[in-house]
Amino acid sequence: MSEKITPLSKTLTRRTFFQKIGGFITTHWLLTSTPFVGAGVLGWAGHDTLTLRHRQFDLFYPTLPNALEGKTICQLSDLHLETLRISPDSIYKSVMVQKPDLIVITGDIISDRTDLDKLNPYLGGLTAPYGKFVVMGNNDYSHLSHTLMKRYLQQFKTLEWTPLLNEASYLPNLKLWIIGIDDPATAHDNVDLAYQKILSSPTTQSNPVFRLALAHSTDCLDDVVKYGAELFLTGHTHGGQIRLPGLQPLITNTYLGDHGFYEGYHVINGIPLYINSGIGESIIPLRLNVPPEIAFFTLHKGDAPPRQQEK
């Protein structure tokens, strides 16, 4: 069933929120709790921050191109390498054990210019037979000058990753379009431009293609709906990052998140959408009740509902 959401609007930034909530938690929760409760909460958060989970989905499409049957897409998001405490080896093993056919990253790889030297250890060894693709997030832009951004993008290319900045790449052997939308949060997105190549490439019912859209944030969903996608992969929310038991996240930094769509798989306005909770952290180097994740999507021909496994 497809949920309907009204047009998007601006929201409170995660940085502003965490600066406020971090002080509140410290002064009014941890410090006023007994030492045992405070230590327990911090221990829980430490465990959640370092426990990398695998979320595996089987997705079914009646018109899936035959070449995509059984193919697996791996999604990484929001690594925030500056404060990331999960090792490169852990991420490498978690990804490569699944033997993905395609790997994508949906933004916020870095949180500081010093993170540029960490790209090779974390991303250099990852391989996929049909390629590796990346889009930018707000942190990628906010911490780099124009000159450093050029160097950053070149580093990805040197490591055999393909940056997609409002452009699409076609894999003819798979009949797959990968549409990379630049970061909406910093107003670098141009969905019309990202879909330009696809609009000039005719398709028919007898020759279907699969459109995989990538963006850091869901805040460009309205425009993606206009053009269509068989799967739209995003991140940015961190699943809330700090989520108290039984409660919705206090901040998600997106319009959809404020309406309850802050992580996981949904169909919204006809678009199958996945919001990745990410791997790293922002502002506060902890996660609570939102462990880091890597997502895998295996495509099948058929009309069955999605199936999910978690490890």
Task: Describe the residue ranges of each PLM region.
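Conserved beta-sheet core of the metallophosphoesterase superfamily
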Residues: 218-295, 303-304
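Membrane-embedded segments
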Residues: 71-154, 158-162
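Active-site neighborhood of phospho(di)ester-bond hydrolases with catalytic His/Asp-centered motifs
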Residues: 76-77, 103-107, 132-138, 164-165, ...
